[in-house]
Every structure is written in structure tokens, then in C-alpha cells.
């Protein structure tokens, strides 16, 4: 962020032990530095405690928040009507997607498990699809042959097509970015868009300058 926006100043940092957050003291310390906004990466039970405490103190929605993962159904189902409006988040608006790949995946997932998919469901499915595609391309399960086959490999995900970049073997599978809102007493994502990974990954020149040449042998 500092590289893109040198004017941004981080006025404080809090690193609560995962699963053991003291939301009150964490927020007290954070707000003592008078931030214009908060960048959050807590999740699970820690996120629920932080949101509840912040709502009670009127920190949210008064102070803008950018939060990773918080738009995922795994966490919105826990937050319920405490979901903080206006947070900018990454997530998974599963009930609003209308692309063919996702419609088929979601319908089959519900039929199999009698529940709606979560982000973990999507990642697991996409991982298996990539493995299947790699084995098919390599026509082998040999490790080295699979490594070679997966460079530039294209595969299908519920979010749409993705690939492993040949230059650094990174997946281009992206993420949904939007804002949180409450509808029917439940948290949901609004004003969302799909951020395709290939549009945000480092340039070839950047990768070559930092990645050992023998890593691609």
C-alpha cells in the first residue's frame, strides 16, 4: 500500500493472538491513535468479538474499515444482524452470481450436502479441478512431470476460468470485492465485483528480478 500510496500513514498496529482476542483492549489501543480508517484481517470468533465490541462502542460504522475475508458466508452467517454496514471486504456473494460455472457448481453442491457452498467449498473444488487438469495434461502422476505440465495450465473454477502463470506458477483465480450491508436481518455483499487475479499480480519483469532462475528448471 505504501508503494502505491506513499501518503498513507500507519498510525498503529495491533496483533492479538489468534483465537484469543481481547476486543475491548484491541479497539481501545487502535482508536487511541485516531485512525482515519482501519485495515482488519481478524476472522472467525475473533472477528465476531471485534464486530460486537465495535458496534457497542459506535466505532463501526463511524470509522471506515477495509477487511479481508469478512464478506465470506462462513463469517456472515456468524455475524448475522451484527454485520457492520459499509465495510469494504473480500468475500463470496454466492446467492447473487449468475455465471454458468457457478450455477452448476452451487446446484450440485446443495444437492450433495444440503447446504449452500462456502469459500472453502469453492477453493477445494477448484483445487481438485486443477489437479485433474494437471494429471490429464501430464498423462502422469509423476511429480516432475506434473510441475512442468502445470506451468501455464488452464483450469475451471466456479468463479470462471483460471490458470497457473508459467512464469511463477501462481494461480490467477481472483476474489470478489464489495461492501457489507444488512438485508432481512442477515449480512450480505453489495456493490461487488470480481477482481481477476491476473489483473493484479506482479509483472513479468518484477518476478524475473526476484525469482531464482533455477526455480523454473
Language-model segments: what does each one mean?
Residues 1-217:
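Extracytosolic ligand-binding ectodomains
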